[in-house]
């Protein structure tokens, strides 16, 4: 009560002000419109203070550049040929970042810096002055590994050309060939670039000859650079300006915008990377999605420069980011390849074709180490899937490991990187099963069914009788290698059920070998074996081929005749004995001894293909006996033997979870 009286006296004593003056923003505020804001916007600006205020100098320069002086391009190459290092040099050359203090600026994930590879395609806007005129350049740094081909193909949708980068010391490699044909099929203007010309082993002439013979590219305009030292990098940007066409679009048409990528921010929710094809977009505009029909208000627009830098407008031809206010409620609403337009223009604007999402071909099961962390693991997986839509997720449960997920990936590296990101970015402790591939069941009534979970594989004799055939996926693998290792590589491919398709020399010492291989063999550490056979000199690329009839069976691990469902796998019959022996030997190492015998078996149906036994603890029941008391001795040993039989009949084997973790670890 006393507090209320004091407040009333203070209000009476305060100077009287007109009500209108109370609505004026504080003097000196740069943008009065931003004075009143929702709590979401407050959090957004607080979470990224340096980027929330648009740079007036930068905006005025961009506004003065017409669309015919825009250039959208990407860098494509084989893994480890220097794409990210070249991106750094281009950013330094255009003044986007300070020189000398940067290393792989566009590799933003911890796993990318740790492994030295690019996993996510990253974008950056640059301004380059050429012959007295400003050009707006948009650069995409793409991954080189085959597992991230979807990232590369999506990047092409926002580009008019590409720098085709080749290592001067290694020449054309398997993924150089694959990336070339992918870019060529999209109609991109390709500029050949030879990197690492400063190396003692560099042979630029050989690399240029390979590009001319293999790709029929005009190498007269090729640029020879060293991204590490910056040699000749300044010649690249004039070539980009002169060779790569400007994007097509009209700022006066209704908005037509493509969602290229998305990621999650703790405060702002889903942030979308977009390419504007027509019209323009500003904060406050109301948009509608063609895929979901949901309407959103735009909270902020901006460009990557190289980090998020807010702008007042994104125009036709530009690539930038947007987020909504209020934000997207569910991450599934951000569909990669979706078209957005302003509300009211849905019937006028034609949606863009979008992307063909690749199918997951490698499957693993993931379980939390602690069952109480299941919900945290689910949230972590959903957030990472927002940024990588090629991953498939299904819930499943195991008697041994509890509730978990069956995850589908494009390849084994894709799976390994996802596992690292879960641990590094979300602190998840997980158990991952070995990778497996789907199989196709063709029933006698003509129905087809693809299964990726071994638990759904029919084992009942009656059900098996209704199956006409079982098929597994095959791939066509392209291998490049020095000819001195040709014999070993052919032997490796043949032992992995491969069928040779072609063999050609593209130089006097380099061979391109094509093999049709089962995908199951490819995910079983084929790449590691290939590197071992060639001392690291071979490269591998592959593409899906077809489904082929195969003798697929379900291999199970049994502990005292009880199956361990989390470890079951679908394998070719020829691999059963090798894999079964490997399983029982490894599992025996991690199982603690019990008071009774533990029998570990690998079995296909009722047929046991391998067995190991964990001996029980044995109590010395003869310790107190006299050596000459033979009948008493025999009686005690018989009693111990009977007790063991009874214990084995009624006792359950307790396998600690750490045993499964150790067994499933690579």
From Swiss-Prot:
Domain of life of the organism encoding this protein: Eukaryota
Entry GO terms, CC: mitochondrial inner membrane; mitochondrial matrix
In the UniProt record, the transit peptide is located at 1-43
**What region holds the tr-type G domain?**
68-248
Please tell me where GTP binds in this chain.
77-84, 141-145, 195-198
**Which UniProt keywords are listed?**
GTP-binding, Hydrolase, Membrane, Mitochondrion, Mitochondrion inner membrane, Nucleotide-binding, Protein biosynthesis, Transit peptide
Q: What gene name is given for the protein in this entry?
A: guf1
One GO term under biological process is:
translation
EC code: 3.6.5.-
Question: PROSITE patterns under this entry?
Answer: G_TR_1, G_TR_2
**Molecular function (Gene Ontology), one example:** GTP binding
- Name of this protein: Translation factor guf1, mitochondrial
